[in-house]
């Protein structure tokens, strides 16, 4: 018998297994690995697999008390990144037994909890995860799903319109509610608490909830349409968050909101369960995501955060605009928009999708386009996102020279014009500006909006881009 041999051995002897056939029940991860100079890619990939599963820096005698073969993560494939020196994609397979059922928190603690500070790596980024069907089935997922939301709101055949109330901090509850009412009356479907509006000295949450509910009901009575305001239930403790959600339910409003990254996955999953049990829609804001996902060589790609949110639960999530002021390339964005909405997504490296993902009927999430968009963007947004999206114009509603309600009218008219043109078979990409101009002839509100924002552009290079595909 070999017995226990103390000492340090190379990770790749145990954790680099290029002959391994992945199982249907494995969680698969694609990591972008940048090793330190002199560290071979196999050792770096194996180190990631080891440190995010059963390994530690030295051999321990207690390894003999378990079956490492059954529980270890395995680096099963490594490929160099085209156009980058010394950067590799390492594919790691994790056995399902390593993860607690129904816990996104535990999944992330295992896969990305420790290994990102590892000295042998210069940088590390989790690009994508393949979640096996067996694991997905342990999650409730979004409280409702896209079709259920449309049925609750009685809105079909078009994207939904929203608006974040600005200035985001400093308004009293009554003035805030007034701004909500004006927007909803003008034709928007939703208004939104800003992500940093929780319960501050200038506006406590209970006052805001009351005035916003009043605003929504008044607008509903006047327009004959169902209206909602995303009441942000994010709080300092889970108990307080649920207390706010309970109050929202007692007011009878249709939707609440949560900042899922700052609030945390445990809190988010609790809130999603509450929302399903009590018929509340759940709007998710991704505040803090760019801290994690913006750098191309380190962190975690947003498509991973989005998949995790679909498992944890949320009916809407902010997903970039492609055309506004915030980061988001078209192919990458559409890749994770499909991951949020569709039931089955094929592997497609040209859109940054590393694995085929089957969601086995887990409800979908509606992507929200928000950030620096206005009426001139409407044709592009309608074309890029299709019907199942929320288009959110904060400044693009409240910045209208005549006020909030005319700003809302302008957006609704522009949207209806784009949907009508699309349904008639017109090319929104080519004819977008003409469609908006035609509509503005019979809508003075839209004409005024077109004039204000005709020259606005946010032209900066995207930081996070796709790798060139090997020819």
Swiss-Prot record:
N6,N6,N6-trimethyllysine carried by residues: 5
The keyword Metal-binding is assigned to this record: yes
Chain residues that bind substrate: 114, 164, 168, 286, 318, 370
Processing after translation: The disulfide bond which can form in the large chain dimeric partners within the hexadecamer appears to be associated with oxidative stress and protein turnover.
GO cellular component assignments: chloroplast
GO biological process: photorespiration; reductive pentose-phosphate cycle
Active site: 166, 285
Residues annotated to bind Mg(2+): 192, 194-195
Residue numbers carrying N6-carboxylysine: 192
Pfam families named among the record's database cross-references: RuBisCO_large, RuBisCO_large_N
E.C. number(s) listed in UniProt: 4.1.1.39
Function: RuBisCO catalyzes two reactions: the carboxylation of D-ribulose 1,5-bisphosphate, the primary event in carbon dioxide fixation, as well as the oxidative fragmentation of the pentose substrate in the photorespiration process. Both reactions occur simultaneously and in competition at the same active site.
Other facts noted in the record for this chain: The basic functional RuBisCO is composed of a large chain homodimer in a 'head-to-tail' conformation. In form I RuBisCO this homodimer is arranged in a barrel-like tetramer with the small subunits forming a tetrameric 'cap' on each end of the 'barrel'.
PANTHER family: RIBULOSE BISPHOSPHATE CARBOXYLASE, RIBULOSE BISPHOSPHATE CARBOXYLASE LARGE CHAIN
Subunit description: Heterohexadecamer of 8 large chains and 8 small chains; disulfide-linked. The disulfide link is formed within the large subunit homodimers.
Official protein name in the record: Ribulose bisphosphate carboxylase large chain
Source organism per UniProt: Strychnos nux-vomica (Poison nut)
Gene: rbcL
């Amino acid at each position: 018998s070999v017995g226990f041999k103390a000492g340090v051995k190379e990770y790749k002897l145990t954790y680099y297994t290029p002959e391994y056939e992945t199982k249907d029940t494995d969680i698969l991860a694609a990591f972008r690995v940048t090793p330190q100079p002199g560290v071979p890619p196999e050792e770096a990939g194996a180190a990631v697999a080891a440190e995010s599963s059963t390994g530690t820096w030295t051999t321990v005698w207690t390894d003999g008390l378990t079956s490492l073969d059954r529980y270890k993560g395995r680096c099963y494939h490594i490929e160099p990144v085209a156009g980058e020196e010394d950067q590799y994609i390492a594919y790691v397979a994790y056995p399902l037994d390593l993860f607690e059922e129904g816990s996104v928190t535990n999944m992330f603690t295992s896969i990305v909890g420790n290994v990102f500070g590892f000295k042998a790596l210069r940088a590390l980024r989790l690009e994508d995860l393949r979640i096996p069907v067996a694991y997905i089935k342990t999650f409730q997922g979004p409280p409702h799903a896209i079709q259920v939301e449309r049925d609750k709101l009685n809105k079909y055949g078009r994207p939904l319109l929203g608006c974040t109330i600005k200035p985001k901090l400093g308004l009293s509850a009554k003035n805030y509610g007034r701004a909500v009412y004006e927007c909803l009356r003008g034709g928007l479907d939703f208004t939104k608490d800003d992500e940093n509006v929780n319960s501050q000295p200038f506006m406590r949450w209970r006052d805001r909830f009351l005035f916003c509910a009043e605003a929504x009901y008044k607008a509903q009575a006047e327009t004959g349409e169902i209206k909602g305001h995303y009441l942000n239930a994010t709080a300092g403790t889970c108990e307080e968050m649920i207390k706010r959600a309970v109050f929202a339910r007692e007011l009878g409003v249709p939707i609440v909101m949560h900042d899922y990254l700052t609030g945390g996955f445990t809190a988010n999953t609790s809130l999603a369960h509450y929302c399903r049990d009590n018929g509340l829609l759940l709007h998710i804001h991704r505040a803090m995501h760019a801290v994690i996902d913006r750098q191309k060589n380190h962190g975690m790609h947003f498509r991973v955060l989005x998949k995790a949110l679909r498992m944890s639960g949320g009916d809407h999530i902010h997903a970039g605009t492609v055309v506004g002021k915030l980061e988001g390339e078209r192919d990458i964005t559409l890749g994770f928009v499909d991951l949020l909405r569709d039931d089955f997504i094929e592997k497609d490296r040209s859109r940054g999708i590393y694995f085929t993902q089957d969601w086995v009927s887990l409800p979908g999430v509606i992507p929200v386009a928000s950030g620096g968009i206005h009426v001139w963007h409407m044709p592009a947004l309608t074309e890029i996102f299709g019907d199942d999206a929320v288009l959110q114009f904060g400044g693009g509603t409240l910045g209208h020279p005549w006020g909030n309600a005319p700003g809302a009218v302008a957006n609704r008219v522009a949207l209806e014009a784009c949907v009508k043109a699309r349904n008639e078979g017109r090319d929104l990409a080519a004819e977008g500006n003409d469609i908006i101009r035609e509509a503005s002839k019979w809508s003075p509100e839209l004409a005024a909006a077109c004039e204000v924002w005709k020259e606005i552009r946010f032209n900066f290079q995207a930081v996070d881009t796709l790798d060139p595909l090997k020819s």
